[in-house]
Amino acid sequence: MEQNGENHLKDPLLQADGGGSGASPAGASPRKERKTRKVMFNVRGISCASCAVSIETVVAGLKGVESVSVSPLQGQAVVQYRPEEADARTIKEAIEGLNFEVDELQEQEIAVCRLQIKGMACTSCSESVERALQMVPGVKKAAVGLALEEAKVHFDPNITSRDLIIEAIEDAGFGADLISSGDDVNKVHLKLEGVSSPEDIKLIQSRLESVEGVNNVECDTAGQTIIVAYDPDVTGPRLLIQCIQDAAQPPKYFNASLYSPPKQREAERHHEIRNYRNQFLWSCLFSVPVFMFSMVLPMISPFGDWLFYKVCNNMTIGMLLRWLLCSPVQFIIGWRFYVGAYHALKRGYSNMDVLVALGTNAAYFYSVYIVLKALTSESFEGQDFFETSAMLISFILLGKYLEVVAKGKTSDALSKLTELAPETACLLTLDKDGNAISETEISTQLLQRNDVIKIVPGEKVPVDGVVIKGQSHVNESMITGEARPIAKKPGDKVIGGTVNDNGCIIVKVTHVGSETALSQIVQLVEAAQLARAPVQKLADRISRFFVPTVVVAAFLTWLGWFVAGQFDIYPREWIPKAMDSFELALQFGISVLVVACPCALGLATPTAVMVATGKGASQGVLIKGGNALEKAHKVKAIIFDKTGTLTVGKPSVVQTKVFSKIPLLELCDLAAGAEANSEHPLSKAIVEYTKKLREQYGSHSDHIMESKDFEVHPGAGVSANVEGKLVLVGNKRLMQEFEVPISSEVEGHMSETEELARTCVLVAIDRTICGALSVSDPLKPEAGRAISYLSSMGISSIMVTGDNWATAKSIAKEVGIGTVFAEIDPVGKAEKIKDLQMKGLTVAMVGDGINDSPALAAADVGLAIGAGTDVAIEAADIVLMRSSLEDVITAIDLSRKTLSRIRLNYVWALGYNVLGMPVAAGVLFPFTGIRLPPWLAGACMAASSVSVVCSSLLLQLYKKPLHVEEVAAGPKNDPDLV
């Protein structure tokens, strides 16, 4: 669909000059070298900033060096260079030439790839893949997720390659397909048109590699497709398409269109499901007749007489038919178990395939022995067990089929997230004055940074951006979990994947591709599902000796029953008809082999973590892996920051006081000039108040005075040189640091302000306090209820703030927090956390990310609240998309529910094996006459894995705690503040 525009692939420059859509590809400057490397040096002897500057100056002057950064505090130098023109040794010698000692260099060129792993069934399998990857030279780090069936590998591309990594996995007996290469960078996949030879593709590749902003180009000559990794700050997919078009020389014509390869994970999952289903159905085609010929028809006349008819000596028609029908099941359909067992034993470990292969082979080859013995003897009579082998394989395949179907549902939440973004967007073409002159519907993947798009009511927001025109309400529940639509006006951010409710808005694109909030959420959840929870170590330890123990137990079971039968320790009537003591013992031994299930143990943790992280993401709670999920359930104390955490984080100046003859506007101008470079909410409040004050005085200028020598004093305030004056803006501690006298009048005003639960910000000019600004930041409406609910969960709440004691105590009293630490700087917050940890408490820290990084990192569990679109917060273990304290409760409650589910899974998996193996070994047989036939034992084994996965799937029914939902449904402030 197109309106007043041309085909967007033929003419990608849809914005007119000055419209802000991006630069022409013709104007993109080609680069001399595409590839760069980064190296880090540990440099000793750096004592000051001037040392760092001297190193940077010398190294930057070397040929081929693109950038250099020296950290005096860490004693490190990071240099990015072009390997064709420079090398690490030359750079090291240059630094040593300045009389600095340089340690051995550490190359930082690490590549990343994600692989789909096929054939993993239990923890032993995932450990085998991980060991195989770690043994590959050049592999730095490898993480394998059993439930996700993926691996993420960090490797040195100078030593190994993706092909060698895949080959190592295949040598270990598993399949591997490349999902993606690169560490989640922006890429576009294009299908080439008009290409007639490999030379054409090479020409296109060279042209693309010369474009500024292109990081890598991968070509598939056979499929005529190309993958381009690019920097969205410099270029974009439409510019790349035009570059391809411009590469053609008449009469040739090149074009490119977006290519969407099949979603590999879903395709592999569906293929695996179809494969197991087909194998099960084929096995039933043979196993059911074997079962009928063995168990049912011999009891029905005249079928019984026919089946017992002797063909040669004592070999009957029934024996021959069962042998012929069972063999395809054993060696064709069951071949996968032989392959899996071979590769496992080859690598020095054992898995479920080993148990299945041993059990079915024992039944099959003993049955073959019986048939051959009957064929060659006129007096021998024996009973074959072909139905055991055939039915066992069929039931195991049925269990695997049900298991992969259930496992596929564990990633439903993640799949729904990936499908939120719309396929198309309405791109506007603007004139020089910013007015829309045409609009064109294009693929969302073709959007570039700074594009301007139109979103009408009911449409999904395609990518992250900022509203530049129009007003509306946007439903963000699918991303943040916020139940109510959020009001949006010019200047507000919108998130890709959310739904525009009732107004038409014009949005400027700010983030595309892998940089969007939705993509970051998906990446974070995928990484979390790859990470192992500490509780998984229990299954890992058990899996190492599980199968050998089962094999020994099965042998001892057979030996015990066989010896007991030979020496008549039990009555002969215990032995079923048509069996002898050896055959009865063999049945018990095979049952023990196949009833044991290591898969259920291996799936207990990863499936629960996978469902929980996906469920949390759908509610705006992003949990960074099983470690954070497990630690959160142990939390006994939570430390809250005040500003932006307990309060709404939108402080405003509500009162001013001048202590000198300086005009109020001049005082505020100087304070705003000093605060303009700070990101703290109080600083923004002062700057905003100054702008409004100017309007009251008749000035409409937004200009803020420039400052020099700006410095942040953590927990105290800021200092700067504004208009030649030393301006200090902060609390009492800042004034004391600069030895500024504080009069009794100032002290009195501070006390009055703090009694009203306001923050008193002092402004000193040239070491004289000239005024004070009273800043109020209202409490979040749910704060009191959230603190009360945490208390009911057995969690104590503590407030640690850099604000004054009076304000802190007033806020704490209002929300119900009993323990308060005030006037604490960011480092002090981390120290308070360590003090609590020394007392044996598991401590969580909740902060808004501003000045809270040390505390978030020091806490056992760091929760960054109100992340919004900024979900890549490194210091936090759990990222909360909204600013609501109810999500803190949701995170901890979800953690507790998940750990309870994992424990239940372990109880079931361990209990099943602990109880199932003795029953299979025949402990009930002497008392009740009940025994577990091998085929039924196999069915029980298959059911155990399915039951564990289904148990984990129950986490999809998780709902927020009742009281918290009541808070969410209650009245709220301005939606912009919540």
From Swiss-Prot:
Tissues expressed in: Highly expressed in roots. Expressed in vascular tissues of the stele, mainly in pericycle cells.
Entry binding sites for Cu(+) 1: C48, C51
Localization per record: Vacuole membrane
Alphabetical UniProt keywords: ATP-binding, Copper, Ion transport, Membrane, Metal-binding, Nucleotide-binding, Repeat, Translocase, Transmembrane, Transmembrane helix, Transport, Vacuole
GO cellular component: plasma membrane; vacuolar membrane
Binding site for Cu(+) 2: C122, C125
Primary site of residence: membrane
Catalytic activity: Cu(+)(in) + ATP + H2O = Cu(+)(out) + ADP + phosphate + H(+)
Topology class, membrane: Multi-pass membrane protein
Residue span(s) of domain HMA: 37-103, 111-177, 186-252
Superkingdom, natural source: Eukaryota
Reported phenotype of the disruption mutant: Reduced plant height and biomass. Reduced fertility. Increased levels of copper in grain, leaf sheath and internodes.
GO biological process, one term: detoxification of copper ion
Residue ranges of the TM segments: 280-300, 315-335, 352-372, 385-405, 545-565, 584-604, 907-927, 935-955
Role, per record: Copper (Cu) transporter that mediates Cu transport in root vacuoles. Involved in Cu detoxification by sequestrating Cu into root vacuoles and limiting translocation of Cu from the roots to the shoots, and accumulation in grains.
Protein name: Copper-transporting ATPase HMA4
Organism: Oryza sativa subsp. japonica
Organism placement in taxonomy: Eukaryota, Viridiplantae, Streptophyta, Embryophyta, Tracheophyta
